């Protein structure tokens, strides 16, 4: 090869970013030389192209009346029931389809609530994917799944969109049982590259030739599993496509995203088209093959050819992905149908070996000005007025348990400088954005990285700080080994605040906090508690602050408090460890509730009192350690003891019966019954519908009590 034989335009490849002079060329040194023919057009980037294009899209939507309450006209979308109906459309028609699809998403979500911003950001990408690929033969995986609404509309579910996230309606995420076009169920983040790689390897082992596409982004690239999967994908070298949906919620240190040049527009289009050039890709494949088949000096030369090809093809920001073994293309304008179709078609048709990553830059909330200006507030929405963007939030006399937790933690931090808070990209969801505003240097957002969050908290505890790790109950599952090995085994005083405990309504089984009591209370050193109301939540935050010799956790539900008086100054009072309380004295039947289930027990007591049965209601407060004296007293003074919890088998009730059995309290006439969530997943729906399906309504508790004492119960239902 000749040294310095070819000069590349600097807008294609420069060290550290894109050149501001698009016509200036830069020569490769002798150590980075490769002879080939490449076009070198002199393109002038338009710094306003992105904003101009966005304005046109917004204007077209407004002109069609899509911001009003009535369903907007969608003549082209009305002809599309499944992806097969898109195949004969022109690119111009695909643009019209995208506009109409975006309008339909806005209209439908305004009526049901749901994840709006993420879905609006991938409209063009969704259209292009279904235009080029053929699901369900080809597999398209949507990471997290909250951006899947356009996908659902195009795959036969448009007529069911008014049922989104409602009882017996469509799931808010992809779900295998809902459609053959949903090849993998999601809800938690950063899983699709792993699953997609498994599908690709399975395809290869079975001799098939379908495509596998994993769409990931919207924060999911902050989780370690995504990089573990890419590392394995690069090693296995199986054909698959990873689409990085970069909507600025992804930790990607790409200079062009923050530099003076816009990351989208004519410049990136030319770069992306060049990078998908089959000749260059085949060059890399030849080099890759040489490195695997030859040794000695020729092996070293072939390795350099591969390295140079990667460098010239990839462009700025690709180093990480290329080092992991993924062929990088991008960045690509995720709202430019022409480019998306061209690149996806090229990638699909080019015979290659190994995984490809296409870096697509999108805008969250695209095409709806209210969502564009406040993508945080329009990530997940309740019902809203499309014309004004105003969300119809229910006016409640009480605040959410999430807010009460945050206020309690702020109150503790005001008087204790060692209190710190950690969350995994969920400042709003956990309430810690309130803590962040008050104590910006004592609140840590670690990204969607629950494993790191737990061990990071363990390290903070080692230094004498008092870390509160606020993670949804269902997301705590992702970091269980860290809870066991890094925290509990070492008796480090990390405090786990587990929001969304129990049934969670519209978010369904992926977010249901069913298992935390079971997997936390089995740990030898963990203190496990749950408040029955918002006042006790304040007290348990104070209790957790005071526990400095071992880890602790407390769970609390989604939804609002019941309206009890709060502690003065929002400052809770520590509870004696392992001490429950009697809320109502009665006879014959004792209802022992744990956490939010205590309120259902009180409701059942009212029903039973109307039928002449005065029962005892107790609030356990602690699952570990149990209030053994309280349980022993209830068991000895009542005919029936019913434990009630909004959790799975193996939780609070199991700990109670273990004690009852070992203490000999089951050897007499006592009748004990546990009431727990059924041993199956409960689908999304209204909270009351979910409780009814679970058999944990006050009427179910009352009926169980009546049945155990031999009284009729039919009138309860």
From Swiss-Prot:
It catalyses: D-glyceraldehyde 3-phosphate + pyruvate + H(+) = 1-deoxy-D-xylulose 5-phosphate + CO2. Thiamine diphosphate binds at residues 146, 187-189, 219-220, 247, 368, 450. Pathway: Metabolic intermediate biosynthesis; 1-deoxy-D-xylulose 5-phosphate biosynthesis; 1-deoxy-D-xylulose 5-phosphate from D-glyceraldehyde 3-phosphate and pyruvate: step 1/1. It comes from the Eukaryota. It comes from Arabidopsis thaliana. This is 1-deoxy-D-xylulose-5-phosphate synthase, chloroplastic. Binds 1 Mg(2+) ion per subunit. Binds 1 thiamine pyrophosphate per subunit. Induction: Circadian-regulated with a peak in the late period of dark phase and early period of the light phase. It is found in: Plastid, Chloroplast stroma. The gene is DXS. Its cofactor is Mg(2+); thiamine diphosphate. Widely expressed. InterPro entries: Dxylulose-5-P_synthase, THDP-binding, Transketo_C/PFOR_II, Transketolase-like_Pyr-bd, Transketolase_BS, Transketolase_C, Transketolase_CS. Disruption phenotype: Albino phenotype and seedling lethal when homozygous. The phenotype is caused by an early arrest in chloroplast differentiation. Pfam families: DXP_synthase_N, Transket_pyr, Transketolase_C. Catalyzes the acyloin condensation reaction between C atoms 2 and 3 of pyruvate and glyceraldehyde 3-phosphate to yield 1-deoxy-D-xylulose-5-phosphate (DXP). Is a limiting enzyme for plastidic isoprenoid biosynthesis and essential for chloroplast development. Plants over-expressing CLA1 show increased levels of plastid isoprenoids derived from the methylerythritol 4-phosphate (MEP) pathway, such as chlorophylls, tocopherols, carotenoids, abscisic acid, and gibberellin. Mutant plants treated with exogenous mevalonic acid partially recover chlorophyll accumulation and plastid development. GO terms for molecular function: 1-deoxy-D-xylulose-5-phosphate synthase activity; identical protein binding; metal ion binding. One of its GO terms (cellular component) is chloroplast. NCBIfam families: dxs (TIGR00204), PRK05444.2-2 (NF003933). One of its GO terms (biological process) is 1-deoxy-D-xylulose 5-phosphate biosynthetic process.
């Amino acid at each position: 090869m000749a040294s310095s034989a070819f000069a590349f335009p600097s807008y294609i490849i420069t060290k550290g970013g894109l050149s501001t002079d698009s016509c200036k060329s830069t020569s490769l040194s002798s150590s980075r030389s490769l002879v080939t023919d490449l076009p070198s057009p002199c393109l002038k980037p338009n710094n306003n192209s992105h904003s101009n294009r966005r304005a046109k899209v917004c204007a077209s939507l407004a002109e069609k009346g899509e911001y009003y309450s009535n369903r907007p006209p969608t003549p082209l979308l009305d002809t599309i029931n499944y992806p097969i109906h898109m195949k004969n459309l022109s690119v111009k028609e695909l643009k019209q389809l995208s506009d109409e699809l975006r309008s339909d998403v806005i209209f439908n979500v305004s009526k049901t609530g749901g994840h709006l911003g993420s879905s609006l950001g991938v409209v063009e990408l969704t259209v292009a994917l279904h235009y080029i690929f053929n699901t369900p033969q080809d597999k398209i995986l949507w990471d997290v799944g909250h951006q899947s609404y356009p996908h659902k509309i195009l795959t036969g579910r448009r007529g069911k969109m008014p049922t989104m996230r409602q009882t017996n309606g469509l799931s808010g995420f992809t779900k295998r049982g809902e459609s053959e076009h949903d090849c993998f169920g999601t809800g938690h983040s950063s899983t699709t590259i792993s699953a997609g790689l498994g599908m690709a390897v399975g395809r290869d082992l079975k001799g098939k030739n379908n495509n596998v596409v994993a769409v990931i982004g919207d924060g999911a690239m902050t989780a370690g599993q995504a990089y573990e999967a890419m590392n394995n994908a690069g090693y296995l070298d199986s054909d698959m496509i990873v689409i990085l949906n970069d909507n600025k919620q992804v930790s990607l240190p790409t200079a062009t995203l923050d530099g003076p040049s816009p990351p989208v527009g004519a410049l990136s289009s030319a770069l992306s088209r060049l990078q998908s050039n089959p000749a260059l890709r085949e060059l890399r494949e030849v080099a890759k093959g040489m490195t695997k088949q030859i040794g000695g000096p020729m092996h070293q030369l072939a390795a350099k050819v591969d390295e140079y090809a990667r460098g010239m093809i990839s462009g700025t920001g690709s180093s990480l992905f290329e080092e992991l073994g993924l062929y990088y293309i991008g960045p690509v304008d995720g709202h430019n149908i022409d480019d998306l179709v061209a690149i996806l078609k090229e990638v699909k048709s080019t015979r290659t070996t190994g995984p490809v990553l296409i870096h697509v830059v999108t805008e969250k909330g695209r095409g709806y000005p209210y969502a564009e200006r406040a993508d945080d507030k329009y990530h997940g929405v309740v019902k809203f007025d499309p014309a004004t963007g105003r969300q119809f939030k229910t006016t409640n006399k009480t605040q959410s348990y999430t807010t009460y937790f945050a206020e309690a933690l702020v109150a503790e931090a005001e008087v204790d400088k060692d209190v710190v808070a950690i969350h995994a990209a969920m400042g709003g969801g956990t309430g810690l954005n309130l803590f962040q505003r008050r104590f910006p240097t004592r609140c840590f957002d670690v990204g969607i990285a629950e494993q790191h969050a737990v061990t990071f908290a363990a390290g903070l505890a080692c230094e004498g700080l008092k870390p509160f790790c606020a993670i949804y109950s269902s997301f705590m599952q992702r970091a269980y080994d860290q809870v066991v090995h890094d925290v509990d085994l070492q008796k480090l005083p990390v405090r786990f605040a587990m929001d969304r405990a129990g049934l969670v309504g519209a978010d369904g089984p992926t977010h249901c906090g069913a298992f935390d009591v079971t997997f936390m209370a089995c740990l030898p050193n963990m203190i496990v508690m749950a408040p029955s109301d918002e006042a006790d939540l304040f007290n348990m935050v104070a209790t957790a602050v005071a526990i400095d010799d071992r880890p602790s956790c407390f769970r609390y539900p989604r939804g609002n408090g019941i309206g009890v008086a709060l502690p003065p100054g929002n400052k809770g009072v520590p509870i004696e460890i392992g001490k429950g309380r009697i809320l109502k004295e009665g006879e014959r039947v004792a209802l022992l509730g744990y956490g939010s289930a205590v309120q259902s027990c009180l409701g059942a007591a009212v029903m039973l009192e109307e039928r002449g049965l005065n029962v005892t209601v107790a609030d356990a407060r602690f699952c570990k350690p149990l209030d053994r004296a309280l349980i022993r007293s209830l068991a000895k003074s009542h005919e029936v003891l019913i434990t009630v919890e909004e959790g799975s088998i193996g939780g609070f009730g199991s700990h109670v019966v273990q004690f009852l059995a070992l203490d000999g309290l089951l050897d007499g006439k006592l009748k004990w019954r546990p009431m727990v969530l059924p041993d199956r997943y409960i689908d999304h729906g209204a909270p009351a519908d979910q409780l009814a399906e679970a058999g944990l309504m006050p009427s179910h508790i009352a009926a169980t009590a009546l049945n155990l004492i031999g009284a009729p119960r039919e009138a309860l239902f």
